[in-house]
């Protein structure tokens, strides 16, 4: 069975190798430069840990506090910040040049739902066969989409033609 190992970035208690340290007590009062034995005995006297905060060449800065409590609260902060992050998903809707009114309305409702959830929506309008000879009809469909979603969405970039496809990305206002 594997056990999860926590990587300590700070040296604690007997792991500190310096002979003398700058000591800050549990009330954040600077004690000054003391021997490591005295610092360890002060920490043990109040049932707390001696933690090396800043490693300095001459005297490392050490503080007396409950390291396990600090580690727990630090993990909790990290997990809370991960929960609050929202990943933006890019959804894609594909249109054709000869789309019917009902099909257009269904896709428009899907687009509205994606935008209201906070997703970006990539619109792809594909030309098939000789339809490529009439790109202005495709641009009319794209402009109609922009007009119909103007209340909740805005184009992230202008519609651009890449080969036989016109692409555009819509985002929430």
Curated annotation (Swiss-Prot):
InterPro entries registered for this protein in UniProt: T_IF-3_C_sf, T_IF-3_N_sf, Translation_initiation_fac_3, Translation_initiation_fac_3_C, Translation_initiation_fac_3_N
Gene3D superfamilies named in the record: Translation initiation factor 3 (IF-3), C-terminal domain, Translation initiation factor 3 (IF-3), N-terminal domain
SUPFAM superfamilies: Translation initiation factor IF3, C-terminal domain, Translation initiation factor IF3, N-terminal domain
Membrane-spanning residues: none
Source domain of life: Bacteria
GO molecular function list: ribosome binding; translation initiation factor activity
Key words, A-Z: Cytoplasm, Initiation factor, Protein biosynthesis
Intracellular or extracellular location(s): Cytoplasm
A GO BP annotation: ribosome disassembly
Cellular component GO terms, alphabetical: cytosol; membrane
Family named by the database record: Belongs to the IF-3 family.
Protein role: IF-3 binds to the 30S ribosomal subunit and shifts the equilibrium between 70S ribosomes and their 50S and 30S subunits in favor of the free subunits, thus enhancing the availability of 30S subunits on which protein synthesis initiation begins.
Listed HAMAP family: IF_3
Subunit structure: Monomer.
Record protein name field: Translation initiation factor IF-3
Organism: Ehrlichia chaffeensis (strain ATCC CRL-10679 / Arkansas)
């Amino acid at each position: 069975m594997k056990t999860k190992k926590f990587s300590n970035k700070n040296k604690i208690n007997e792991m500190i190798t310096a002979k003398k340290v700058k000591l800050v007590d549990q009330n954040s009062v600077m004690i000054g430069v003391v021997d490591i034995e005295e610092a360890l005995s002060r920490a043990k006297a109040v049932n707390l840990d001696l933690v090396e905060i800043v490693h300095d060449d001459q005297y490392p800065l050490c503080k007396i506090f409950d390291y396990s409590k600090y580690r727990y609260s630090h993990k909790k902060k990290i997990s809370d910040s991960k929960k609050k992050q929202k990943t933006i998903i890019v959804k894609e809707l594909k249109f054709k040049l000869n789309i019917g009114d009902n099909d257009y309305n269904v896709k428009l409702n899907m687009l509205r739902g994606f935008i209201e959830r906070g997703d970006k929506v990539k619109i792809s309008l594909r030309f098939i066969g000789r339809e490529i000879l009439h790109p202005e009809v495709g641009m009319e469909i794209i402009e109609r989409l922009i007009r119909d979603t103007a209340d909740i969405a805005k184009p992230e970039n202008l519609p651009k033609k890449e080969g036989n496809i016109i692409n555009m990305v819509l985002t929430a206002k």
